[in-house]
Amino acid sequence: MSLFQVYARALQYLAVHKFRVGAIVIANIVLAAITIAEPILFGRIIDAISSQKDVAPMLLLWAGFGVFNTIAFVLVSREADRLAHGRRASLLTEAFGRIVSMPLSWHSQRGTSNALHTLLRACETLFGLWLEFMRQHLATAVALMLLIPTAFAMDVRLSLILVVLGAAYVMISKVVMSRTKEGQAAVEGHYHTVFSHVSDSISNVSVVHSYNRIEAETRELKKFTQRLLSAQYPVLDWWALASGLNRIASTISMMAILVIGTVLVQRGELGVGEVIAFIGFANLLIGRLDQMKAFATQIFEARAKLEDFFQLEDSVQDREEPADAGELKGVVGEVEFRDISFDFANSAQGVRNVSFKAKAGQTIAIVGPTGAGKTTLVNLLQRVHEPKHGQILIDGVDIATVTRKSLRRSIATVFQDAGLMNRSIGENIRLGREDASLDEVMAAAEAAAASDFIEDRLNGYDTVVGERGNRLSGGERQRVAIARAILKNAPILVLDEATSALDVETEARVKDAIDALRKDRTTFIIAHRLSTVREADLVIFMDQGRVVEMGGFHELSQSNGRFAALLRASGILTDEDVRKSLTAA
């Protein structure tokens, strides 16, 4: 993207406040006009003093300009600050909502820390651009547009010096930006690396401590920061050189105005006041050009940060719901997969040609080795991923035609890692249903065999569980997650390795809760512990993304196939059981 495209898109985010921005634009035009008028008025005051005329009216006018300029600048700055701060907060909220809605595959490929870093840096960068646009950029642009024609109207010869000065600034900035474009992009890449390393180390601090990695991780961070500085220093050197060249051009221009102005005054071709006005113009131009250079530098540095954010925004908008998406209502729970295929990007993993039908209220167990596609299958059901081919129907309705929100309202999931947030136990359970009363939360906890350990804690349901629930044991976390699913009371239930983190005693306590939860619900169970799938109405054995075997638990256990072999390997089924079943057959 060009600098202009980056800047234009950054300003588009202000369109939601177009009337407030419009008022600030008008105020900036007025302020710019006053800025141009001041040197002219000052020159006329000098001429009046030289000719011993009455200067009181002009001094009062000059003072009035000064007072008005000060008050107007304060008001513009105040409104600009409020608008920029408010828009930054709303953009952060909007972008957060869109990013969180992206599929897990997107987050896995991009990296959580990368998306977070991109969002935060972009919001701060946009905030700076908005603020400077409303405070300085616009006023500077208007002042420059008014200054040049006003100067030419007064004297063409001195005006040409101002034009040459402006051209010198533009050429110097253009050369420096072309020389440092790749370097600045590299700097931004190094910032992402540093942020990712810090985020990764802190989020895995227990591993860092356990394996004595503190010094090693610190050394690694130092190495990344050194690479960042190695990329940053050449960019800074170029901009330092540009500042020096601009300063030389400014000094030469000022000297030229003084020398030529003196000669013209001595010849009687120009008044002293006009030379003073041009000196004021030159100072004004130098100041405004310095602001424009700073503005160009700001946009140049912002481009690397914002291009990544704009790409992120575009990828998120591509996933927005179609306008004609319907609502999934009154779900009974009949689920059908019709020839579903899906592949992860840059990977051979996925699912291929999966077809089956589950009646309402049935329990479907999905088993198979790691990487077989079990979790992918239930993620497709929840539209975490979109299938490349085929249809998934709930009660005969293609889920691709309904909103994700209404679809997921009909599905409750208990994850393998519980998925608790750093909030209170009560708030984590209420994720199932935000408007639930405390009595309903407590009833759900009781049904999940979680009320005992919750009430034993000092703050009870107000106990904050820590990041990812690290202040609770694995079994406690899982029971809170089950309580959350109970509270949601959805017609379709997904248990993704829901009991894998539990010991035998706790699993026995939770089994009753899960059995109660499964009642009258279509339930999908993903499990490595095959003992948990005995009561399944339908068992789907998957391998390498394909359905290898499908049938009832007893049917498959007696078929001497892959599922039966897995049962024998886990000790649930013995060779004697197989012989008996074959004899009975």
From Swiss-Prot:
One protein family per Pfam: ABC_membrane
Membrane-spanning segments: 22-42, 55-75, 136-156, 158-178, 245-265, 269-289
Catalytic activity: [(1->2)-beta-D-glucosyl](n)(in) + ATP + H2O = [(1->2)-beta-D-glucosyl](n)(out) + ADP + phosphate + H(+)
Enzyme category, top tier: translocase
Protein name per the record: Beta-(1-->2)glucan export ATP-binding/permease protein NdvA
Keyword entries, A-Z: ATP-binding, Cell inner membrane, Cell membrane, Membrane, Nucleotide-binding, Sugar transport, Translocase, Transmembrane, Transmembrane helix, Transport
Principal subcellular localisation of the protein: membrane
Role, per record: Involved in beta-(1-->2)glucan export which is required for nodulation of legume roots. May be involved in other classes of oligosaccharides export. Transmembrane domains (TMD) form a pore in the inner membrane and the ATP-binding domain (NBD) is responsible for energy generation.
Subcellular location: Cell inner membrane
Subunit structure: Homodimer.
GO molecular function: ABC-type beta-glucan transporter activity; ABC-type oligopeptide transporter activity; ATP binding; ATP hydrolysis activity
Species in which this protein is naturally found: Rhizobium meliloti (strain 1021) (Ensifer meliloti)
Enzyme Commission number(s): 7.5.2.3
Domain of life: Bacteria
Family statement: Belongs to the ABC transporter superfamily. Beta-(1-->2)glucan exporter (TC 3.A.1.108.1) family.
Binding, ATP: G368, P369, T370, G371, A372, G373, K374, T375
Keyword Magnesium attached: no
Domain notes for this protein: In NdvA the ATP-binding domain (NBD) and the transmembrane domain (TMD) are fused.
Keyword Cell membrane annotated: yes
Gene Ontology terms: cellular component: plasma membrane
Residues annotated as domain ABC transporter: 335-569
Residue ranges constituting the ABC transmembrane type-1 domain according to the UniProt record: 21-301
Record's bilayer topology term: Multi-pass membrane protein
